[in-house]
């Protein structure tokens, strides 16, 4: 990565003879979207981001915090949080639990900010060990699933253009939650019969309407529906879960590890995102717990560079479904990392999270 990106925004650590300490640096960065990203509740043309480096001796780990509006974090809040961290107290980066517990204790919430350091620390440790994290976790890269390609709420012309871009992908992810949901699916079905999955982004506030849509979507070769109703509507979600003929996946309802048990009985599966889970460490624990509860597991992302997307991809051999196309939606990526080959995730045989700066 260009050194200039990290000029002037850091928490330098003192160096002592014969001793290496963790050194954190960070810099705001704006992700430019190829198309306006239209969801049920908002629209945007860029996503604020903070890029992070964590140094230990000659090793550098990369991380990032991506902040779509609904997370409630900003570049300013992330930088304020990172400025509070004193990682120079740690001379052994392998004290992972202790370091992450310290980071989590500095302030509540700030999940994306915490994730940025967690990702950088995992990248750093993997590089020191000379292994990618999927191998450290004992996972087989051949088991990585196909990933979906996201098509947001948009005009017919833009939707058809996005379908051309999605040609290599086996599964399409459709953003819904507005009055023209069925028309969007009809446009897609006029072009392709590939399986779809639907993310309603909490857009259906009527349980009866949600059930009607789910039954209609089943006829449209839909695999599952994410977050059909507002996360606060727990009783209505329970009603819907009892009646729906498609799997229902928790997204906004789910943030961190304790939420997995809360989702059990209300949803059939969970969508894990590093920016919500505070990073790779807790995301892995969430996936293991969901498996133990016989729930489906999905790994997703925000609009992110290949840094965070490749970090999330390390989990992909452990999941049923993946939605890891956030790096493909931006025009100014900073890294080379995981690839999509014939619609399937291909994990690089590089240490850490598998990325190199462009």
Please place each PLM-identified region on the residue numbering:
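N-terminal export signals
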Residues: 1-14
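Metal- or metallocofactor-binding catalytic centers and their adjacent structured scaffolds
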Residues: 19-26, 42, 54-56, 60-128
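Flexible C-terminal active-site loop/helix
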Residues: 20, 24-33, 49, 57, ...
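Short Pro/Gly-enriched beta-strand edge/turn motifs at strand-loop
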Residues: 30-38, 219
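Conserved, mostly hydrophobic/aromatic
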Residues: 52, 58, 117, 130, ...
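Hydrophobic faces of well-ordered beta-strands that scaffold small-molecule active sites
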Residues: 61-63, 145-151, 170-174, 196-200, ...
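Metal-dependent enolase-superfamily TIM-barrel catalytic cores that perform enediolate-based chemistry
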Residues: 133-244
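Catalytic alpha/beta core domains of metabolic enzymes, predominantly
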Residues: 232-324
């Amino acid at each position: 990565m260009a050194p200039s990106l990290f000029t002037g925004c850091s928490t330098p650590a003192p160096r002592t003879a014969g001793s290496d300490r963790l050194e954190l640096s960070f810099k705001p960065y704006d992700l430019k979207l190829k198309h306006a990203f239209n969801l049920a509740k908002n629209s945007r043309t860029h996503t604020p981001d903070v890029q992070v480096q964590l140094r230990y001796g000659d090793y550098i780990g990369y991380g990032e915090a991506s902040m779509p509006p609904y997370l409630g974090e900003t570049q300013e809040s992330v930088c304020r949080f990172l400025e509070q961290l004193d990682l120079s107290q740690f001379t052994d980066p392998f004290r992972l639990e202790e370091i992450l517990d310290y980071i989590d204790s500095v302030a509540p919430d700030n999940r994306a900010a915490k994730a940025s350091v967690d990702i950088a620390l995992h990248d750093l440790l993997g590089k020191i060990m000379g292994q990618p994290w999927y191998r450290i976790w004992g996972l087989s890269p051949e088991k990585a699933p196909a990933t979906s390609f996201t098509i947001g709420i948009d005009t017919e012309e833009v939707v058809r253009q996005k379908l051309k871009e999605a040609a290599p992908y086996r599964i399409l992810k459709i953003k819904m939650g507005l009055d023209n949901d069925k028309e969007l699916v009809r446009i897609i079905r006029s072009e392709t019969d590939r399986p779809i999955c639907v993310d309603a982004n909490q857009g259906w506030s009527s349980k009866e309407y949600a059930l009607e849509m789910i039954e209609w979507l089943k006829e449209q070769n839909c695999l599952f529906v994410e977050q059909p109703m507002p996360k606060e509507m727990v009783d209505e979600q329970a009603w819907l879960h009892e009646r729906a003929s498609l799997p229902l996946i928790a997204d906004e309802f789910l943030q961190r590890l304790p939420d997995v048990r809360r989702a059990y009985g209300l949803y059939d599966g969970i969508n894990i995102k590093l920016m919500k889970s505070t990073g790779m460490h807790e995301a892995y624990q969430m996936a293991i717990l969901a498996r133990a509860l016989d729930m489906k597991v999905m790994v997703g992302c925000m609009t992110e560079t290949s840094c965070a997307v490749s970090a999330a991809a390390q989990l992909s051999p452990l999941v049923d479904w993946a939605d890891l196309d956030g790096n493909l939606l931006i025009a100014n990526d900073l890294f080379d990392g995981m690839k999509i080959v014939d619609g399937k995730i291909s994990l690089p045989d590089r240490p850490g999270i598998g990325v190199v700066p462009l």
